[in-house]
Each structure stands twice: as structure tokens, then as C-alpha cells.
A protein has these predicted regions:
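Short, contiguous pre-domain boundary segments
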Residues: 1-3
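Conserved alpha/beta-hydrolase catalytic His-Asp/Glu region
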Residues: 6-67
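Catalytic active-site module of serine/aspartate enzymes centered on a nucleophile-bearing elbow/loop
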Residues: 99-133
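Conserved serine/cysteine hydrolase catalytic core
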Residues: 41-97, 102-105
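Glycosyltransferase donor-binding loop in the core domain
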Residues: 7, 83, 110-113
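Residue-level signal for the nucleotide or nucleotide-sugar donor/cofactor binding architecture
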Residues: 10, 86, 116
Length: 133
């Protein structure tokens, strides 16, 4: 029931101010949070303001993904070392299913690696792409 209740705010400014990353991204700069918040707020049917995401996402159960073994292209998995969403074991399990998978752990980042340590993400992407035939 709690997941179906949406928190709304009287003004757009209130909603933007209350926007937070989930999971938290403590390394992300406040200016980035504010910029993303500006694009993540929408006006609801009742005229109040809420966040533009589907709350049903949080009720999707984890499941085995046997189709991963059929992915034949090189695949890069980026995992933030401090991620509370994707464990090291979970990332390795994904990588083990991908015939051409490569795992890179990003230090100084949780689940949202591209927000918390964009320089390390860029380096990992460049290295991955440079190694492609």
C-alpha cells in the first residue's frame, strides 16, 4: 500500500527542493541534484507536484535472467563499490552469465556511478571501448 501512495507538494519549488536520489548518491554534487530535480518534477492531475517516476518499479521482484547467456556482444557492467543495490556477488553473477562480460568496480560511488564518480565511469568506458576489436 505504501508504494502506491505518491508524495506530492503544493508548489514546483517545494518538489524540486525535496527531490532526493534513490538510492542516495552522497558523492553527487548538489548542483547536479538540483538540475536533475528540475527535470524530474511533474504536475499531477490534482494540480499538485510530484516526481516523474513509476512507483511500481519498487515492487518488481528480482528474478533469474537466463537470457543473459545468449548476449554475444561485449558487455560492460559498472558497479559502485559502495552500492547497496548491486552487491559484488550479484555483479559477478551477472558477469558470469554474460559470455563476453566485463566487470569494473567504481570507487567513490554507490549505485549511481555516473553521478557520483563520472570521471571514473568515463575512464572505464574509454578503456572498454578501446579494447574492442
Amino acid at each position: 500500500l505504501a508504494l502506491t501512495l505518491r508524495r506530492t507538494y503544493a508548489t514546483r519549488a517545494d518538489a524540486v527542493r525535496r527531490f532526493r536520489f534513490f538510492p542516495p548518491a552522497p558523492q553527487a554534487p548538489e548542483t547536479l541534484r538540483a538540475a536533475i530535480a528540475e527535470h524530474s518534477v511533474r504536475r499531477e492531475a490534482d494540480g499538485r507536484y510530484g516526481f516523474a517516476f513509476d512507483p511500481r518499479w519498487f515492487s518488481i521482484p528480482s528474478r533469474p535472467r537466463p537470457e543473459l547467456s545468449s548476449v554475444q556482444c561485449p558487455t560492460l557492467i559498472l558497479r559502485g563499490r559502495e552500492s547497496e543495490i548491486l552487491s559484488r556477488e550479484g555483479a559477478r553473477a551477472l558477469m558470469d552469465e554474460l559470455p563476453r562480460g566485463r566487470l569494473v568496480e567504481i570507487s567513490g560511488a554507490g549505485h549511481q556511478t555516473h553521478l557520483e564518480n563520472p570521471d571514473a565511469v568515463l575512464l572505464a568506458l574509454r578503456n572498454f571501448l578501446a579494447a574492442l576489436p
